[in-house]
C-alpha cells in the first residue's frame, strides 16, 4: 500500500514530457550561476512544483527537497557572455548582425584573401588561379548594378567621415538609414553623393545627441560647409526629420575632455548652462560659443584656467565670440569672476 503514491507520482512524471526537453538558454550574462525555474515539472519525492535547472552543475533539481531529477543536462546556450542586448546581438553565433552601413546589409559572403586551405596549408598554383577568378566574380555579384555601386560608394564615404570624426556605431547606422531613405525617395538626383552622405551624417549626429558642427563635418568630408547645410535642410524637409535645436550642454563633455579639464569643471559648466537656459540666454546664439564661454568661466572659477585661445581652438569659434558670451553669462547670472 505504501508504494501507491510513488507509482502515482511516477505516472505524473511520465506524463510531463517537458522534463526531458532542452530549453534554449539565451541569457548568458550570469552563466556561472544559472537557476531556471520550470513550473510544469513535479518532484516524484515530495510533489513540489518548485523545480529549477542548474546549468552550473548540469542538473534538474527540486528546490524544496533537493531531489535530483536529471543529471548531465546539456546547456544549449552560447559559450560567450553578454551584458546587454547590443552585445548579445553582436555575439550571436548565427553570423554577424545585420548592418545598414554595408550596401547589402552584411548578408552576402566574401571569399577570404588568404590562399590557404582549411588546415592552413598553401594551395597549389591551379587552385590559386581558380580562387582569383572566384573572388573577382564574387565582387561583381555583390555589386550588380549602378545603383548598388553608388550606394556602396556612399556608405564607404559615410564610414570614412565617421571614422575621421570618431563617431560611434549608432550614429553610423542612423546616418546609413537616412541615406537609404533619401535614395528611395529619389533625393540624390542632381546632388553629389558626398554631399548627401555628409548631410545624413550631420543629421544623425543631431538625432543621436552626439553633436558635431557643420565645420567639423565639412573638414572630414570633401564638401564645403554651405553645400552640406543646404543639402541637410533639403533632406530634413523631404524626409520629415524633426530635430530640436542643439543644446550647448551636449558639447561640454567633448570640449572639457579635449581641454583635459577635471569633472568638477565640466559639472560647473553644465550648471551655468542650465541656469542660462532658464533665463533664455542660449536661444538665438551659437551653441558652441555659449558652451565654450561656460567652460571658460568654470575653468577660471575652479582654478584650472584655460586661455580663451585654447578654448576657442577646441570649440571652433573665435575669441571675440567667447568674450561676448562670457560677458552675457557673467552679467545676467551674477557670476563674480576674478581674472
Curated annotation (Swiss-Prot):
Entry annotated with the keyword Zinc-finger: yes
Keywords: Metal-binding, Repeat, Transcription, Transcription regulation, Zinc, Zinc-finger
Signal peptide boundaries: none
UniProt xrefs under CDD domains: CYCLIN_TFIIB_archaea_like_rpt1, CYCLIN_TFIIB_archaea_like_rpt2
InterPro entries for the chain: Cyclin-like_dom (IPR013763), Cyclin-like_sf (IPR036915), TFIIB (IPR000812), TFIIB_arc (IPR023484), TFIIB_CS (IPR023486), TFIIB_cyclin (IPR013150), Znf_TFIIB (IPR013137)
Zn-finger (TFIIB-type) residues: 39-70
Repeat region (Sequence), residues: 156-239, 250-331
One Pfam family of this chain: Zn_Ribbon_TF
MF (Gene Ontology): DNA-binding transcription factor activity; TBP-class protein binding; zinc ion binding
Residues reported to bind Zn(2+): 43, 46, 62, 65
Regions that span the bilayer: none
GO aspect biological process, one term: transcription preinitiation complex assembly
GO cellular component, one term: transcription preinitiation complex
Superkingdom to which the source organism belongs: Archaea
PROSITE patterns recorded: TFIIB, ZF_TFIIB
Function: Stabilizes TBP binding to an archaeal box-A promoter. Also responsible for recruiting RNA polymerase II to the pre-initiation complex (DNA-TBP-TFIIB).
Recorded family membership: Belongs to the TFIIB family.
Protein name per the record: Transcription initiation factor IIB
The organism's taxonomic lineage, starting at the top: Archaea, Methanobacteriati, Methanobacteriota, Methanomada group, Methanococci
